[in-house]
Amino acid sequence: DRAGTEIRLNKQFDWAGHHWVIPAVYSCSKGLVVDFCMRAEAEDIRRFIAKWNLTAENDSAENFTQEQQMQMELENPLDLDFSAKIKLNGKTLQSSHGCAVGIIPCLPDGVANEKVAQAAAAHYGLDDSYGWMIYRESYPWGRKRRPEIKSLSLAMEQQPCHVPGPHFKTHAPGDSFSFSHPVSGTEYTLTVQELEEQAISQQQFDSNRWCYPTHFTAMSYTISPEPDDDISICDCAEGDRPLEIAPCADSYAPEARNGIVCVGVIGGTVGPAAVVFGKNAQGHLHAVCSALHFEPVAEDIEWRIEFHVVQFPRKTFLLI
């Protein structure tokens, strides 16, 4: 395909705690391409790097717990999960795919930003004293012919972010735990209905190379009052790492890591019947599974409550 026609806009607005620039859109044969530039203060980036001691040797997710990673995502001034719908001539267009690059103004000596990020920042004349995330999203026309752009608006919407909540342990059915929502302040009580040790067949992993952990604890529970879909429960512990039982000749094959859980197996081809509980009709029954281990866990599982929170309201901006 030929390069799209650049339409310079230089539209600027403030949303979700950031200053944004929409420098240009590109009218292509199959759709519209939009570049979103989200600005971050250099000092905020420095504080974030210092707080988490991020260095070239200490920037891997494996160096941090799941809860630390969640907190880092919340605090990272260059991280915001959002969706953007385009309304073109009154018709809504959905993004089909996208990509992103970042500019960090306070990198240590000897470390440089990606060349493609530098080129994009230079092309748009972005102030290099700030940090920037440059998102590029593609919006198919939804028709065979490229339309003439008469009006163009943008609806920005934050995706729910994961906020770590309190921990609790359960020993037996009937145990309960009370907690409050960090945004609404609503008080909830979680009550355990069933708590069982279970195991998955090794055959369900369908692997000749790896031996996977198969033991887990399954818990069903109710929450009162019944919440929206913005509360979930997860195991605080990491799962056991799979063991390699046969070598792999492919040097590019993926490497097994920690944090194995049984959700994918239970919700996959074997179906949710892999978790079996007795009948219970009191309230809406929820279910959660612990991380996988090679041996049954003797101690009580420590669970974490997670909240899925939208911090900023949806907002529409006129581009053309």
Model-derived features: positions:
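Alpha-helical, hydrophobic structural elements that either
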Residues: 1-320
